[in-house]
Amino acid sequence: MMLPPTPRVLALREIVGDVRALAPRGRVIVAVDGGGGTAAFADDLAEVFREAGSDTHRASVGDFHRPRADRTLLGPETPTGFYRDSFDYGTLRRVLIDPFRMAGSTGFQTAAFDEARDVPVESRWETAGPDAVLVIDGEFLLRPELRREWNASVLLVNAPERAIYEEEARPREVATILVDDSDPVAPVRVARPESA
């Protein structure tokens, strides 16, 4: 099904074209990072991948939180604690990224933890074809220990970055594509900052 050619869809088609130029076949993982609006952007990006005929799956790092007690070790809602302790990257790799990359009949999970109820979710395993796309959204996906996991990354620059993340990960410098999504109807690509 062809999506209507709105400014947003046209911008997303361009991004899909760029990603496919980088990784035309095989298992492809695209990260959508940013402080806000990542879920809606990633949902729409996944739809455009589907429109192009790709077997596309969606996940959010928000479904890989750590238990509340572990997230608040440095105090409730501290910026450092939020950056360092919010997400369970080991589980993200073990049940989603690594099995997705294995291809074949290996199953993967797109969620592992329910933050609102503070409990693990029941395992729901998915499989995909050899040329599948996984679009994952959320904060801090371009941190140093994750950035090599993605075939491509989109950084939404419509929200101020958290200082510790910006300082440590420099997401604007490593993202494949920068997008200002402050007007969701008409997202605009942003030029990469000059190197210092």
Q: Where do the language-model regions lie?
A:
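Glycine-rich phosphate-binding P-loop
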Residues: 31-47
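NTP-dependent small-molecule kinase module
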Residues: 3-22, 148, 166-196
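Post-Walker A helix-loop "phosphate-sensing" segment adjacent to the P-loop in P-loop NTPases
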Residues: 47-57
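ATP-dependent NMP and nucleoside kinases share a basic, alpha-helical "lid"
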Residues: 117-159
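Pre-Walker A (Motif I) flank of P-loop NTPase domains
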Residues: 24-30, 131
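Conserved beta-strand scaffold positions in the cores of enzyme catalytic domains, especially
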Residues: 56-58, 153-155, 176-178
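A glycine- and Lys/Arg-enriched "phosphate-lid" helix/loop adjacent to the NTP-binding pocket
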Residues: 76-83, 145-170, 190-194
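Conserved nucleotide-sensing/catalytic segment adjacent to the nucleotide-binding pocket
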Residues: 57-60, 65-117, 133
